[in-house]
């Protein structure tokens, strides 16, 4: 396993659309190593999720997982470890629940983004088994954020207002910009 370099905003790879993962790909040693590396990279950076494009791989692959309080997102609930291939998301509520999002590709900053609190997600797992699930709350927000990366979208593209964007140290624990 290896910690991979996380690409930062400005790198053109982050703005490209990823390709689907094929069933034959998931059987390869390289793909299995990629998944292990992604989990290790995510944990090393204290992230909740990581999309393959963030490490320069243009494949529709996301890993998520947060077992206990994450230092970057105190007070947030657990997110189960999950490998997600070729996701499709359908919003089931209007984009009204706001959250101060951060991103490993936009280090040291946060922005207020409103997203649907309830989604339907179809995806395949690491065994290429298809899943279809209704997801709500924090996990739904995390999954939408990570899946955006697969289509070249960063959370800064979804800011409610550029006035609600700043450095971590300028945002208090309640998510308000400090004066």
From Swiss-Prot:
Pfam family of the protein (one): Pep_deformylase
Cofactor stoichiometry and binding remark: Binds 1 Fe(2+) ion.
Residues annotated as binding Fe cation: 103, 145, 149
Class of this enzyme: hydrolase
Catalytic residues of the enzyme: 146
InterPro entries: Peptide_deformylase (IPR023635), Peptide_deformylase_sf (IPR036821)
Protease is among the record's keywords: no
Keywords noted in UniProt: Hydrolase, Iron, Metal-binding, Protein biosynthesis
Catalytic activity reported: N-terminal N-formyl-L-methionyl-[peptide] + H2O = N-terminal L-methionyl-[peptide] + formate
EC numbers, comma separated: 3.5.1.88
A GO molecular-function annotation: peptide deformylase activity
Cofactor(s) recorded in Swiss-Prot or TrEMBL: Fe(2+)
Domain of life of the organism encoding this protein: Bacteria
The keyword Translocase appears for this protein: no
A biological-process GO annotation: translation
NCBIfam families according to UniProt: pept_deformyl, PRK00150.1-3
Function: Removes the formyl group from the N-terminal Met of newly synthesized proteins. Requires at least a dipeptide for an efficient rate of reaction. N-terminal L-methionine is a prerequisite for activity but the enzyme has broad specificity at other positions.
Family statement drawn from the similarity comment of this UniProt entry: Belongs to the polypeptide deformylase family.
Record protein name field: Peptide deformylase
Species for this entry: Leptospira biflexa serovar Patoc (strain Patoc 1 / ATCC 23582 / Paris)
């Amino acid at each position: 396993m290896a910690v991979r370099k996380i690409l930062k905003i400005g790198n053109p790879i982050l703005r490209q659309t990823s390709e689907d993962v094929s069933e034959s790909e998931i059987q390869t040693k390289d793909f299995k190593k990629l998944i292990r590396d992604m989990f290790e990279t995510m944990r090393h950076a204290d992230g909740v999720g990581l999309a393959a494009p963030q490490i320069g791989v243009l494949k529709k692959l996301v890993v998520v997982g947060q077992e206990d309080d994450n230092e970057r997102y105190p007070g947030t609930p657990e997110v189960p470890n999950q490998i997600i291939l070729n996701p499709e998301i359908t919003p089931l509520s209007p984009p009204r629940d706001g959250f101060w999002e951060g991103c490993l590709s936009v280090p040291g900053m946060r922005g207020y983004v409103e997203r649907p609190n309830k989604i339907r997600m179809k995806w395949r797992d690491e065994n290429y088994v298809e899943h279809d699930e209704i997801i709500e709350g924090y996990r739904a927000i995390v999954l939408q954020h990570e899946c955006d990366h697969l289509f070249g979208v960063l959370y800064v593209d979804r800011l409610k207002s550029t006035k609600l964007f700043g450095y971590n140290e300028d945002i208090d624990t309640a998510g308000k910009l400090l004066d």
